[in-house]
């Protein structure tokens, strides 16, 4: 587990909390889109079936697949996991083989969107709650309109308070085949689309770093031993006082700089693959200079 700097833990919301919140919000159906796995779907089905109060909620299988360029594609209606790391055409072929529906997730997000290749998907996510830079959603909406694509909104929820932040309404029977067919017939509409709050993004960051601390430190120890003490001190400092003034200022600064990068990439034509290239020099330059 020491060969990758990627954070392994992404969401700490329990299945129980998600289902009871769906019940309270009177949500009829959920697609569970965990990263590169169907395990969350299977676990949620098991929990729901063991609690009579929750059985009215329909739960359908889906996956958020990471392709070879680190972009994300949603697959709705699959029953076998689609492996990550394939190129976009291989991934879409694998989705079609299961008679499922593909959707470009947050396509113009700078770090993990597939950008104009979204045209290859059945649908496009034109509003993502975590795109608080605004530009990513604006460009996605325009791209969808220009290319007459089917649009949906996604909560992309990683903390409990953002669950149901976006809701789509579909004119169909509450059965998987009917839902997929009617989505492709443009019988869906975005019923609710609201952005995550800055505090919710900070909460997500805290969970990821706290849950993944050992993994990150092990990676640094193996690959960058000279930086281990500094990284450990920084993590310990943040995790012990995440709500301190210092970390709130740094968090707000990080969001501001990421918004500047998104504006340059999405509105001014700068290199859209800056995160893929992992060039921190370029990133810092883009965020700081006009």
Q: What is the meaning of each model-derived region?
A:
Residues 27, 53, 100, 148, ...:
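Residue-level recognition of short, well-ordered coil/turn positions
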Residues 1-11, 41, 77-165, 169, ...:
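Domain-core and long-helix interface of multi-subunit machines
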Residues 56, 72, 167:
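A residue-level signal for beta-strand positions that form part of recognition/binding surfaces
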Residues 70-76:
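Active-site segment of extracytoplasmic enzymes that catalyze sulfate/phosphate-ester chemistry
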Residues 1-69, 92, 118, 161, ...:
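An N-terminally biased module of ancient metal coordination in phosphate/nucleic-acid-related enzymes
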Residues 147-150, 160-290:
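C-terminal functional module detector
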């Amino acid at each position: 587990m020491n060969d990758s700097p990627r954070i392994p833990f992404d969401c700490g919301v329990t299945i129980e909390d998600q289902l009871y919140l769906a019940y309270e919000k009177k949500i009829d159906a959920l697609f569970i889109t965990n990263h590169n796995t169907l395990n969350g779907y299977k676990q949620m089905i098991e929990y729901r079936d063991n609690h009579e109060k929750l059985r009215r909620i329909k739960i359908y299988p889906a996956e958020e697949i990471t392709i070879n360029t680190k972009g994300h594609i949603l697959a709705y209606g699959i029953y076998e996991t689609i492996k990550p790391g394939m190129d976009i055409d291989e991934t879409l072929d694998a989705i079609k083989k299961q008679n499922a529906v593909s959707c470009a997730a947050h396509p113009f997000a700078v770090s993990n969107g597939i950008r104009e290749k979204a045209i290859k998907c059945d649908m496009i996510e034109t509003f993502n709650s975590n795109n608080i830079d605004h530009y990513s959603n604006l460009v996605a909406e325009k791209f969808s309109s220009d290319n007459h694509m089917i649009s949906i909104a996604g909560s992309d929820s990683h903390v409990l308070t953002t669950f149901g932040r976006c809701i789509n309404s579909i004119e169909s029977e509450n059965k998987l085949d009917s839902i997929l067919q009617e989505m492709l017939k443009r019988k869906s509409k975005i019923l609710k689309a609201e952005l995550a709050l800055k505090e919710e993004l900070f909460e997500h960051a805290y969970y990821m770093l706290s849950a993944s601390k050992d993994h990150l430190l092990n990676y640094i120890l193996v690959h960058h031993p000279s930086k281990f003490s500094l990284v450990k001190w920084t993590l310990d400092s943040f995790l012990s006082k995440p709500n301190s003034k210092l970390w709130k200022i740094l968090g707000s600064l990080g969001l501001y700089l990421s918004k500047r990068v998104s504006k340059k990439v999405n509105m001014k034509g700068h290199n859209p693959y800056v995160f893929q290239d992992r060039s921190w020099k370029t990133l810092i330059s883009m965020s700081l200079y006009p």
